[in-house]
Structure formats: structure tokens, C-alpha cells
């Protein structure tokens, strides 16, 4: 038998020690049970037991040694070879490229961490107040559906069932959520915190500690242990007011809250009858409505009802779409009127009640926005023949929830009940009207089918052109943008009964066209469709034709001035000459004749003002024989400094002067140059400036000559000799005033 090595010897020593400890412990227990014995007997017995224990220990050691195989050296070599083989295999696996684990969901399934999307195994995507986020796909799930009942059970690393497939009780999760929906309860703390929540009402921030009268129960150890868990917790009641709620401290749990009372609220389906004033008969907003109805109750379109009381068909108000789990509130309740039993075409279904007023008052009220809508608002119906309307926005009956559609199945008609002797309303004490406004079926309507009435568009609304077969692109810009604005406003306050997927709805056609138009607007950030429409309208209002270059505009302006100036001057002087009396006589009084002469019609506006001023001045009447015009023979003899009456001032007369041959030649050259200028294309800027300066100098010289001639003629003697002398003087004046060019002036200096 070989000698055991150090390792084997240590194993034997440990075995003997354990055996000795167990025997000693057992012997001590037995000694405690025996009781009190003499010291001598105990000493003998202990000596025998020790001897016996040593024998047993030796026997156990020998038995243990016999179990060890003899060739220990060979086993050691074999274990060393196996260790070397495992080390080599490990190195080979490390050198080989490791395969990354494949997720069971594609990358497209992963969403943004702040998206706030809920995807749970219960197939309900609403927030129940306690959700947890997956670390891989960043989607949120109901914690209760995965068996997480409170915050303490939230794990540090969490994966949903899609990212980490495992056995989850889906039926139980659906049952829990269905029970929550059926209860329809809302905790008061969740309603208080709804304003501060983010990501569609779900706040992903860490929950705060519940406090009572300012005392804090959180500890540093709790914050360290649950730091990662708080990132995933989403209790809807993340903060509770200490005045309304209290907390109790438990030795095992750290923090627990008191049970909360559940408050039951009515849904829109059950509470619709409490948001309006129910009526039993129509209310007249104007005192003239009732006389109007009594006067026109025998019109042709009024239907004679064969009974004394109206018998209606049962209807029901219920939601046409479930908005309890929608992420955004549309701004209006989605309720409709449904029929409880079948009816055929022409049956009278239900009476419409509300406040009656004249159609004109609705149009003139700016709160109705009829200029934008172009139709009646929700719960308002226009009468098709009379200038009245029924307003059920504040009071009425269940027909106020009637929706409009492009394919209606009911219409509003007027019926007249049979006359009775005592038709008094017991509640109001007034005589009830025989005229009723009821709904009539346009076709056969089956049970549980929603009732629709037609849209009552204005006669000038652009949508009527679409109904007649025109397209939106065929409309002009003003009608197109007005139509988009009107339809967007209408759909933001209600929906058409045609549905969101109808191809025959004209409102949806306009909405789809507007959506394609909004895509063309480039916005820096998130922008509402209303703002995009305003941007389009602003661009349309500010849209102008691109202006030509400044030089081209200046040339056109100067060209127009050159062309218009001679015409305006000629017309002015011709009219001025025609408005003067021919002859050498200058009348001093009564220059304005009250008779309708042809010359007075063509007089300028200033003469009309002067005539109005002179008519207000009282002039003393004189005999017709004494009213003789004063003829001035010499202008130097006349002194006008002492004249105080404006009618006594002399008016200079422009005498016709024959043109000389040189003036005629200049006019011919003018006309030729003008024609050449018209036929030629746009000249260069330098040539144009030269022509402009020449034309301006010529027109100024011509105007100055005419004014000089007029002033000279008015002050010279009006004899034939003086006229001939004036013509000779004007011709010599023209020759003497000829301007020298720079070249001629230089030649003159050189001489």
C-alpha cells in the first residue's frame, strides 16, 4: 500500500476531525439528559468513551483510505492532460468570432424611448396608471398583466413577452383589463395629475415619496436599492396631496398608502341627457314667430296630419365610435341617433324640438361664423321653405344629436295636426301649436341604423360646384382656399355621416386635397394644419408678379411720360383757348354766363368752383342797359390795384398766331423723330437719356414760348397792325433765342 500524499492526508484529517466532533457532541447531549451522577462514575465512563471513540475514528480513517485508488500518480497525470485539453479548447473558442444573440423582434419594432407607445399582451393600448417599459423595444406594457402588482416587484432588467418569449397567462391579463374597463372608475389622484403628465398622459418620471404633514419616510437605502426600478415604474398617482391623503409606516414594508375610495362617473353615453334642457314643445325666441306660423300654416308644403296628436317612432342615442381609448380628445361627443325598429319610406319618425327664430338673426350673429361655415352649425337646422331655423344647442330633445351626411336618409318636413278645442299645455299654460317639425324617412330604414340629414349649404358655397361635377383644381384660387378653410373648420367641430373611408363624401375629398397641399408647406418644427393653411393664404395674398429690373422700369416710365406730355399739354391749351371768348374785347363783369352754352360744358373744374363761389356772393342788380363790358385799349392804362371784386378782374385772352415756316419745320422733325422712336426697339441708356433731355428742353421751350406769347398778347393793343407786329416779333424772338451747341461756341471763340 502506497503512502498517501499531502492532499490525501488532509482529507483523512478532516474526516477524523468531523467524526470526533460529532461523537463528542452526541456524548455531551447524552450527558445532559442523564442528570446528576457522581464524579467518579462520570470520569470512568468518559475515559471508556474516549477510548472507544479513538478506535472508531481509526476504523473510519482506514475505511476512507481503502476507498482511494492506489495509482494516484496516474490519475493526477490524467487530470492534468484533461485540464490542458480544456484550456486549448477554451483558447480556440476565444479566437473564433462570437455570434451575437439574435432578438426575436426586428429593428423596426423598436421605438423611441419617449414615444410612449403601449403594446401589451392584453391587446389594450390604454394607460391603466401602472405601466412598465421594455429595455429593448422601449414599448410600455401593463405591469399587472405580467404579474407585477406593486412597485417593489418591478425588476431592474425587464423585457416584454415579444423581446423575451416566455409563458404568460394572456387570458388572465385580458380578464383583469376587462374588469377594469367594466368598472369605469377613476381615482381622484389620477385626475389631479393629468395636467402634469407627459407623453399622452403618461409620466415616465420617478415617483415621489408620500408625505404626511411634511414628514418624509424615504431613506438612503431605499433610494439606492430602487434607483433602477423607478425608471420603469409609472404609477398614475405619482404625487398625492398631504391634505387629502395620509400614509402609514410599516416595519416590513417601508411605505404603504391608505385604501382610496372609488368615485363612479357617467360616460358620455349615459350622461348625454344631462347636458341640455329637455323640451316638450318648441320655444319662440321672437314674438313674431307664432303669428308667422299661424299665418302660413296653410301653405302648400305643409302636410295635413290625420291625427290630433303626433305618434313618433322610438329612437335611441348612442355613440357611433368608441373614444374611451383614443389618445386625443376630438373636441366633441361622437353620438348619433339610431332607430329602434324598422320603418318604410315616408314614415314620420320623430319631432324636432328647440328654439325657433328667424333665419336673418342667425346670419347676422357673428358667433355663428356663417361667413366661414357656409352652412348651419351642429344641432341647428334651417327650414327648407320658411325663413326660420331650429336651434337645439341649449335645449331640445334627443334629435339634437342628429348628424349630417352627403347621403341622408331623413328630411325635415312640416305637418299640421288636426284642430282640437282644448289644446293647452299643462306645464306652461299656453296654447300649443298645431305646427310640428318632424323627420320623414327618405327610404326604407332598418332597425339599429343611424339617421342622417342633409347638409344645408349656402347658395354661393364653392362645394356646390363639386356636387355638380366640377373638380377642385378647376376652381379659382379664392374659391379653392375658401372651400378648404370652410371644410377644415366644419370637420374640426364634427364629422360627416359618410364615414372616414367613403369615396363619395365631398368633405373628405376636400380634406384629402388639403392634406396634399399641406405637404408642400415646409415647416421648421411641428405645425398644425390650420397654421399651414394660414401660411398658404399669406403666400397667396402676398403673391405678386416679379418686378422687372430698375433700369427697365425707369425707361418705361420716362417713355410713358414723353408720350403723354405733349398730348396732355395740347389738350390743356386747346381747352383753355376754347374756353375764352374770341375777339379783342375783355369783359370785366358777368364773365360767367348762367345759360347752358356749349362752351361752358368743356370748362375745367376750377371754373365750376369759381361759379359756385360767385353764386354765393350777392351782387346788386343793375339795369341791363348799364351792364356794358369795359373795353381796355391799352394795357398800361388799366390799374387793378383798387379792384376788390374778383369778377371785375380782366381775363387774358389767348390770340391765335400763325406759325412761321421754321416752327412748321420743327414740328415735322418732332413727328418724324417720334415715329422713329416708336418703331425702334428699347434704346440704350445713354441714347435714351439724350433723347429725354432733348424732349424735355423742347417741351419747356415750347411751353415758355406759348406762355410768353399769351402774356404779350394780353397786354398789347388788339389791332390788326399789332397782331402782325406780334407775329413778326415772335419770329424774330425765336431766331434770337437759338442756343449754340458746344462745337459752335468753340468755333465762335476761335474766330
From Swiss-Prot:
Modification type Phosphothreonine: residues: 719
| Ranges where the SET domain occurs | 313-456
**Domain of life of the source:** Eukaryota
Q: Where is the sequence biased in composition, kind Basic and acidic residues?
A: 39-52, 691-707
Q: Which InterPro entries match?
A: Set3/4_SET, SET_dom, SET_dom_sf, Zinc_finger_PHD-type_CS, Znf_FYVE_PHD, Znf_PHD, Znf_PHD-finger, Znf_RING/FYVE/PHD
The entry lists its GO molecular-function terms as: histone H3K4me3 reader activity; methylated histone binding; zinc ion binding
- Biased-composition ranges for Polar residues? 206-222, 235-255, 681-690
| SMART domains referenced in this protein's UniProt entry, alphabetically | PHD, SET
- Entry-linked CDD domains: PHD_MLL5, SET_SpSET3-like
- Tell me the segments the record calls region Disordered: 24-52, 79-105, 181-258, 662-738
User: Can the keyword Lipid biosynthesis be found in this entry's annotation?
Assistant: no
Show the Pfam families listed in the entry.
Answer: PHD_5, SET
Modification sites for Phosphoserine:
236, 684, 718, 741
* Biological processes, Gene Ontology terms: cellular response to starvation; DNA damage response; meiotic cell cycle; negative regulation of meiotic nuclear division; regulation of DNA-templated transcription; transcription initiation-coupled chromatin remodeling
Q: Describe the function of this protein.
A: Transcriptional regulator that acts via the formation of large multiprotein complexes that modify and/or remodel the chromatin. Required for both gene activation and repression. Part of the Set3C complex, which is required to repress early/middle sporulation genes during meiosis. Required for the transcriptional activation of genes with high activity.
The family annotation for this protein states: Belongs to the SET3 family.
Could you describe the subunit structure of this protein? Identified in the Set3C complex with HOS2, HST1, SNT1, SIF2, CPR1 and HOS4/YIL112W.
Task: From the Swiss-Prot or TrEMBL record, give the protein name.
Answer: SET domain-containing protein 3
The record's gene field reads: SET3
